[in-house]
A protein has these predicted regions:
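Active-site metal-binding motif and surrounding structural segment of the metallo-beta-lactamase
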Residues: 40-91, 119-121
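Short, surface-exposed connector motifs at secondary-structure boundaries
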Residues: 30, 56, 82-87, 261-268
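Hydrophobic packing residues within well-ordered alpha-helices of enzyme cores
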Residues: 46, 72, 100-103, 220, ...
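Conserved beta-strand hairpin/beta-sheet module of binuclear metal-dependent hydrolase folds
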Residues: 1-49, 85-87, 150-152, 200-211, ...
Length: 305
């Protein structure tokens, strides 16, 4: 099974604190590296992750609030100073495109790599990135500005070859791909060896949904149904539920309600309000509804399995 890792660079909310950095994550999957949100200081957290800047394939911005995007221009500038030459695609809400182009023209005139912004319609659930091994789709969220989440999904892989059976039946290497794709094997005596005897089931495709920032959306459980890991903002406890509704955020209990209803494997909590010196109160509230809840923390590397 190939590595599928979530690096938490920042899990705080809008008000800066000495404890938490602004929202940002790195997703490692299928040999690629994607950044989700890029709050102020994200590139410093990037360095602490021990992932080389050159491995960054694309950046996805959920919405245009500063704690999710103020680090973008600094990061793009650093990539240029480090000698990046390959194109970098930035997926962000479509309203950002004019400002993005102005910022690039003003700050990035000497950069020797191409930056392409892909405008995203945050009101549609759609695949915005696809390659041979994975897809990234948007999930509309309810916030004070256009906002969407992202679901990273592995594509199904071929079954695993049973090496013992290949050796036992003397099947040549040239036939391995055919067998992986479902072919039976006929030996010299004309006996047909069924494919099921020659392979083991493929690993189940894994998935990760990132949902921040959003008001409580009961319907969201259908959009993230069955994902392996769900990151859902948990800015407040239930004592601040009215405040969460006003500012289009969620409580830890509401995040856990989505996780339980969607049947996800694990819930990662994050986007903590600066009012909480100890986020355990958020964790306790979430675990009362969904036991497989975890507090995200800067420096955490979570394996999606």
């Amino acid at each position: 099974m190939e590595p599928f890792k979530i690096h938490i660079l920042g899990c705080g909310s809008a008000l800066p604190t000495l404890k938490h950095s602004a929202s940002s994550q790195l997703i490692e999957m299928r040999g690629k590296c994607f950044m989700v949100d890029c709050g102020e200081g994200a590139q410093m957290q990037f360095r602490r992750s021990h992932i080389h800047f050159s491995k960054l394939n694309a950046i996805f911005i959920s919405h245009m609030h500063g704690d999710h995007c103020f680090g973008l221009m600094g990061l793009l500038s650093t990539l240029g100073m480090l000698g990046r030459t390959s194109k970098l695609r930035i997926y962000a809400p479509k309203d950002y495109e004019p400002l993005f182009r102005q910022q690039v023209e003003f700050f990035m005139q000497t950069m020797e790599y191409e930056m392409e912004m892909i405008p995203v319609d945050t009101e549609k659930q759609q695949v915005i990135y696809e390659d041979h091994s994975l897809t990234v789709e948007t999930v509309p969220l309810q916030h004070r500005v256009p906002c969407c989440g992202f679901i990273f999904r592995e594509k199904p892989t071929l079954p695993h070859i049973r090496r013992d059976m290949i050796d036992y039946y003397g099947i040549p290497v040239s036939q391995i791909n055919n067998i992986k794709n479902g072919a039976d094997w006929t030996n010299e005596d004309g006996d047909v060896i069924p494919n099921a005897r020659l392979v083991q089931p493929a690993d189940s495709p894994r998935s990760y949904a990132y949902c921040s920032d959003t008001r409580f959306m009961p319907a969201l459980k259908e959009q993230v149904k069955g994902v392996t890991v769900l990151y859902h903002e948990s800015t407040y406890t239930s004592e601040q539920e009215d405040r969460a509704k006003i500012y289009y955020h969620s409580t830890a209990r509401q995040a856990a309600t989505i996780a339980a209803g969607a049947g996800v494997g694990t819930l990662l909590l994050g986007h903590y309000s600066a009012r909480y010196n100890d986020e355990k109160v958020l964790l306790e509230e979430a675990k009362a509804v969904f036991d497989h809840s975890i507090l995200s923390q800067e420096g955490m590397v979570f394996d999606v399995v």
